[in-house]
Amino acid sequence: MASRKDTLVRRASRVRRQIKAVANGRPRLSVHRSSKNIYAQIIDDVAGKTIASASTLDTDLRSSLKTGADTEAATAVGKLLAERASKAGIKDVVFDRGAFIYHGRIKALAEAAREGGLNF
């Protein structure tokens, strides 16, 4: 019987494999959530570099948020990431949810990033 960690790793690699098939050179918006915070970054897989990143640990957001583990915090991170991506000249990305289902905080971050101007 596979452990929970093995299942999550397998799911994340399956999602990443599908993303690389449809990316067409677009950077990847990778999302990670923990029980206390949420992190997002835009990665150029060709160059292996992070273009823009945002999390609830950023000093800009930390003081204005009640907690880093709710949909309000995820929305703020999505907006901040979209703003930083537009400064870097990024409009089109491919969304990498990792092993997390598209629900709750992950969905809130994605919708806020779309409202901020990212296309995926």
From Swiss-Prot:
- CDD domains hit by this protein: Ribosomal_L18_L5e
Tell me which UniProt keywords the record has, alphabetically: Ribonucleoprotein, Ribosomal protein, RNA-binding, rRNA-binding
> What GO terms describe the biological role, i.e. biological process, of this protein?
translation
Q: Which Pfam families match?
A: Ribosomal_L18p
Q: Which InterPro entries match?
A: Ribosomal_uL18_bac-type, Ribosomal_uL18_bac/euk
Q: Name one GO cellular component term.
A: cytosolic large ribosomal subunit
Q: Which GO terms describe its molecular function?
A: 5S rRNA binding; structural constituent of ribosome
Q: Tell me how this protein assembles.
A: Part of the 50S ribosomal subunit; part of the 5S rRNA/L5/L18/L25 subcomplex. Contacts the 5S and 23S rRNAs.
Q: What does this gene product do?
A: This is one of the proteins that bind and probably mediate the attachment of the 5S RNA into the large ribosomal subunit, where it forms part of the central protuberance.
Family in the record: Belongs to the universal ribosomal protein uL18 family.
Under what name is this protein listed? Large ribosomal subunit protein uL18
Origin species: Rhizobium meliloti (strain 1021) (Ensifer meliloti)
Its ancestry begins with: Bacteria, Pseudomonadati, Pseudomonadota, Alphaproteobacteria, Hyphomicrobiales
